[in-house]
């Protein structure tokens, strides 16, 4: 069986799809990946990858869309626009590579197309070549809502996206509520990389891992300055992953590191502080560590509020990060207990390898 996996040309959209793609391959199926941009700059486990969006520049697309919709842009930057802006944003993005995905599907003749909710070019391709399409969640919004928003956008309105043969849901029900579909565990995948020896085990003191988004953009605020200012009064070691280029002199309990596979680092951390991307949230939950999520544009406020509502972490604006907040993050037993409960909930969900047989049965 040949499977085509399609994502928007962004690393954070592609990486969550890799574990299922690898499970397909390990089960003896042929897997092709269609994406672009920085999504193809990371280790995809040896999967055959096709660049369907050469020269893709998300920043330029976002700038044009937000300029056309200034009132919605203001709500989007505050994380209050729901799916209104994301539909136009990713509709415009998909329009730049949908023809290439369709051409690839016609040439390679997959038996099934798996696509993420904001990579609906995959759904168009499945419809055009007459094979089942499967939507795989890679964030905390309902997949159907996102697909509908992108499909209804001006740039994608002329393309028909058929109803998916199945929807794979990865959000733990205690976080977002139960959802119809085929449940699957969100298995973190960071795209390879080396882990320094000092991060391969727990330290003598609590450890806070701090990471930044792989997508540059306005809004939300960078918490780095507040973290560095608070650090001397925090009884923990703080690790800044891929920090901004210029930093002041760091306190003794703050270290920096380049890109590391967070799925191999977080299990030894006490807490995780990040920008609120869905991959970061699900990775932190899978590791069972409390999170401090900085609300921001797009889905980041939604994600931060979901984590805080579940009790598995805190939602704190960048400029409101203080020693008291960081000390609570590593000492509040209720946060740690809730984070472990969600970890156990996710661990009980079916693995990607468990859902492959059910998806294989969809072949026409």
Tell me the role of every PLM-derived stretch:
Residues 128-142:
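Active-site proximal beta-strand in glycosyltransferases
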Residues 77-84, 140-154, 306:
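Acceptor-binding helix/loop patch of EC 2.4 sugar-transfer enzymes
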Residues 5, 135-137, 209-212:
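Short beta-strands and strand-loop turn motifs
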Residues 1-123, 129-131, 232, 239, ...:
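Glycosyltransferase specificity loop/lid
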Residues 51, 135, 167-170, 183-185, ...:
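Structural signal for conserved beta-strand scaffold positions within catalytic alpha/beta enzyme cores
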Residues 34-40, 145, 150-218, 241-246:
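A nucleotide-sugar donor-handling region in carbohydrate enzymes
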Residues 22, 185-271, 281:
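Donor-nucleotide binding loops and adjacent catalytic segments primarily
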Residues 132-136, 181-187, 225-226, 289-292:
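A short, gly/pro- and small-residue-rich
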